[in-house]
Amino acid sequence: MTFELQHTDTASDARTGIITTDHGQIRTPIFMPVGTVGSVKGVHFSELRQQVQAQIILGNTYHLYLRPGLEVLRKAGGLHGFNTWDRPILTDSGGFQVFSLTGIRKLREEGCEFRSHIDGSKHIFTPENVMDTQRIIGADIMMALDECPPGQSDYEYARKSLGMTQRWLDRCIRRFNETEPLYGHSQSLFPIVQGCTFKDLRREAAKFVADKGADGNAIGGLAVGEPKEAMYEMIEVINEILPKDRPRYLMGVGTPQNILEAIERGVDMFDCVMPTRNGRNAMLFTYEGTMNMRNKKWEMDFTPIDPDGCEIDRIHSKAYLHHLFKAQELLAMQIASIHNLAFYLRLVTDARQHIEQGDFVTWKRSVIEKLGERR
């Protein structure tokens, strides 16, 4: 994997670039649809390519490890062979999912013991077997195993947790370097910066990660309950230290406003389940604000869902989508999910264009307030 930094905004830390993988190029800033179990909920890959114009998707190591399992994935030739997605894939380490399973996991130096949410069977994730698992999945970009402490953790816990994450990172790197890709395409490993909302811990973590010289770096443990101002402050602290010639990935973020604020602060890559989750619940993101398609106000509105959006937005009316949600038709959730994903991709594409034009900050200010309105 390589990263070419193309343009840096003169009025902010926003930048554009190109990530090149063996499965294709990714133009940054980029939003990555979440395909937890190897599929993006309710959206076929043909629609991801043509309507959404997704350049890369995510898979989840925890879920794929449990089902379909490593034997199936290895025999299929990895996730690319299994689901036939022919563009880049990033997998998270599964750590966030394991640590969110409070009451059914046990953390220790070796790794994290947990019980399957499917059948209750016992498992352990270690830095070594998480690297092995992601080799079998075959993602273009692999994530290191880390502990993601709760957003309101006290300093002592955050300090201990960061130490564990750093020791695990060293073990991940060692195992990654000891093993080879299985399917003929290269793979890259991204470390993750943790440290809650403590500036000194975030600085220490960013320096530790930067010294590893990885192909790219991730920022974890944000958007987990802390005020958004604290999240933006942590991004600034971290990006002062992370190398400028490597892509920066903000994990699990977020709203359109969050994404624009993070782009302004030098972040390149984003993922979040919000576009599809909110879409399934009749909430549509637009430049004019968020629309609840169950509201009666749309019943007689025969204008396009979004006249500037993807083809599906242009051919279907708000009234039709309102009807589908009232009738509880599955197509409603599909259309809304496609719209939201396409909007997120359009948002980062527009951001890229304005960074290159030199007016990103002015453009961001002109759109960000409306993005948060309810219609």
What are these regions (language model features)?
Residues Y65, P150-G151, G225-E226, N278-G279, ...:
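Short secondary-structure capping/turn micro-motifs that flank functional sites
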Residues A139, D170, R174-N177, E240-P243, ...:
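Generic secondary-structure signature for well-ordered alpha-helical cores
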Residues Q152-Y155, R159, G216-L222, L330-M333:
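Glycine- and acidic
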